[in-house]
């Protein structure tokens, strides 16, 4: 039997008992100790991205580094490669002009390495040998301060995203800078994915609230979406993946949902992740507890990280900021199980920002608050 939070509360059940009685199983996992071997002079920061190529090599995009990034903090982007046994191989793109504030790394079917840098508004493709050959977007020529037209509405929007209900006048636009939809240009992009024809899809992102598309030659084709909560609208599209049937899945974090589109941007369906929070298990490592939150990026189930397993029968792995769990989800939106709980120990999570899933039995997780990458070994398939 399935319980909604509201129904359970009306029945006088505690949050703990809701978790115990709802139908989503808690799935077993093993977190492998020290999966990556770092040189003595390299240190991880916030882990914005993690990816695995066809040879089992692991790529980590960390908010740390040896170069001087121009935005947000002194060193805010470093791309590292490890072999299948976790041995350090190299740093890619050292002192690269685009490095500013790491957000995502992905590997395409040809083993090219794609990085999304939120701070420089750039998405780059590296060849497997480690040199850039495609560049999307352009970094600004100088740092400057943008003064929002209405500071009160900016703060109201931030509070809304944290789950605090605020009254914002309809005529005021609390998004700043104002979204500008230009070809080959981004404003705080977040992720990238590809379809079976080699087209690229970009989630763009914190400001522009849209999805961009380029063809197999790297030529800009189109974009869709705008700021809002209706079908085909977004509030911080934070992750993106494409199924074998070429359906585009977008993690619409601020609206706490995953939307699905065809490759022309036509809306197909959407679904939400509704798994009650057991507040007695694990202490959150960021923000504040809001187990009954239904809106905003910090609400339970708001998709922060998104990964689709390869092969003909894929599943989704979705991570949230609060309470920091991983959900195993069918492509139709059924939650098949949940992994982990908030915390700092192995098998616990603090702000899941990146997931790589070379199979259902092997999951790599990048965390912002805990400054680490975990390798999770699981058992079972979507049919179990």
Locate each region found by the language model.
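Eukaryotic scaffold repeat domains enriched in small/polar residues
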Residues: 21-384
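Bacterial N-terminal signal peptides
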Residues: 5-17
């Amino acid at each position: 039997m399935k319980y909604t939070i509201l129904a359970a509360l009306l029945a006088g059940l505690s949050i703990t008992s809701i978790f115990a009685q709802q139908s989503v199983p808690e799935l077993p996992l093993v977190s492998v100790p020290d999966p990556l071997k770092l040189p003595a002079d390299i240190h991880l920061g916030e882990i914005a991205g993690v990816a695995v190529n066809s040879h089992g090599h692991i790529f980590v995009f960390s908010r740390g580094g040896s170069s001087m990034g121009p935005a947000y903090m002194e060193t805010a982007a470093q791309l590292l490669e490890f072999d299948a046994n976790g041995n350090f191989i190299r740093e890619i793109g050292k002192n690269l002009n685009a490095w500013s504030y790491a957000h995502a790394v992905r590997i395409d079917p040809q083993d090219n390495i794609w990085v999304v840098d939120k701070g420089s508004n750039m998405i780059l493709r590296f060849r497997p040998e480690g040199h850039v050959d495609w560049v999307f977007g352009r970094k600004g020529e100088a740092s400057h301060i943008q003064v929002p037209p209405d500071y009160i509405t900016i703060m109201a929007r931030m509070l809304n995203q944290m789950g605090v209900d605020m009254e914002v006048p309809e005529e005021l636009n609390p998004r700043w800078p104002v979204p500008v939809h230009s070809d080959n240009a981004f404003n705080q992009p977040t992720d990238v994915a590809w379809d079976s024809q080699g087209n690229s899809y970009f989630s763009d992102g914190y400001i522009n609230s849209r999805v961009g598309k380029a063809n197999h030659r790297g030529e800009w084709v189109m974009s869709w979406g705008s700021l809002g909560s209706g079908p085909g609208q977004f509030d911080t599209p934070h992750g993106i993946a494409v199924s074998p049937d070429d359906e585009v899945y977008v993690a619409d974090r601020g609206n706490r949902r995953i939307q699905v589109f065809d490759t022309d941007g036509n809306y197909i369906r959407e679904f939400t992740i509704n798994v009650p929070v057991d507040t007695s298990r694990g202490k959150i490592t960021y923000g504040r507890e809001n187990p009954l939150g239904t809106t905003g990026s910090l609400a339970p189930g708001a998709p922060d990280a998104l990964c689709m397993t390869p092969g003909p029968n894929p599943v989704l792995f979705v991570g949230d900021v609060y309470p920091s769990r991983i959900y195993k989800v069918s492509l139709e939106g059924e939650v098949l199980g949940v992994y982990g709980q908030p915390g700092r120990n192995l098998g616990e999570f603090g702000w899941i920002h990146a997931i790589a899933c070379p199979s259902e039995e092997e999951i790599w997780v990048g965390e912002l608050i805990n400054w680490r990458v975990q390798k999770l070994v699981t058992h079972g398939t979507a049919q179990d």
